[in-house]
């Protein structure tokens, strides 16, 4: 049996915080799956990487000096752009409400 890292109450709380509807019948499945994933992550964490040069595997910070200079271009007009959107209003793209 896999070690228990999370329990039923934590899965229910996590689903509630993520605004997910989780049926009671599936809670135990998620508990088992989550514990399996965490156990696998624990195995990966336990791997000895002391002989690996980490500097070679980490990307350096991308700063302004690494970015190209902005160039203002006009590839198409506002009307051409708006001709490809389903709904526009006052020269703007109208999108569905995503936050209640």
Curated annotation (Swiss-Prot):
GO biological process: regulation of translational fidelity; translation
Any Pfam family the entry gives: GatC
Oligomeric and partner information: Heterotrimer of A, B and C subunits.
Name of protein: Glutamyl-tRNA(Gln) amidotransferase subunit C
E.C. numbers: 6.3.5.-
Chemical reaction(s) catalysed: L-glutamyl-tRNA(Gln) + L-glutamine + ATP + H2O = L-glutaminyl-tRNA(Gln) + L-glutamate + ADP + phosphate + H(+); L-aspartyl-tRNA(Asn) + L-glutamine + ATP + H2O = L-asparaginyl-tRNA(Asn) + L-glutamate + ADP + phosphate + 2 H(+)
Lineage of the organism: Bacteria, Pseudomonadati, Chlamydiota, Chlamydiia, Chlamydiales
GO molecular function: asparaginyl-tRNA synthase (glutamine-hydrolyzing) activity; ATP binding; glutaminyl-tRNA synthase (glutamine-hydrolyzing) activity
Stored SUPFAM superfamilies: Glu-tRNAGln amidotransferase C subunit
Entries under InterPro entries matching the protein: Asp/Glu-ADT_sf_sub_c, GatC
Species per Swiss-Prot/TrEMBL record: Chlamydia trachomatis serovar D (strain ATCC VR-885 / DSM 19411 / UW-3/Cx)
Record-stated family: Belongs to the GatC family.
Keyword Nucleotide-binding listed: yes
HAMAP family linked to this entry: GatC
Entry keyword set: ATP-binding, Ligase, Nucleotide-binding, Protein biosynthesis
UniProt function note: Allows the formation of correctly charged Asn-tRNA(Asn) or Gln-tRNA(Gln) through the transamidation of misacylated Asp-tRNA(Asn) or Glu-tRNA(Gln) in organisms which lack either or both of asparaginyl-tRNA or glutaminyl-tRNA synthetases. The reaction takes place in the presence of glutamine and ATP through an activated phospho-Asp-tRNA(Asn) or phospho-Glu-tRNA(Gln).
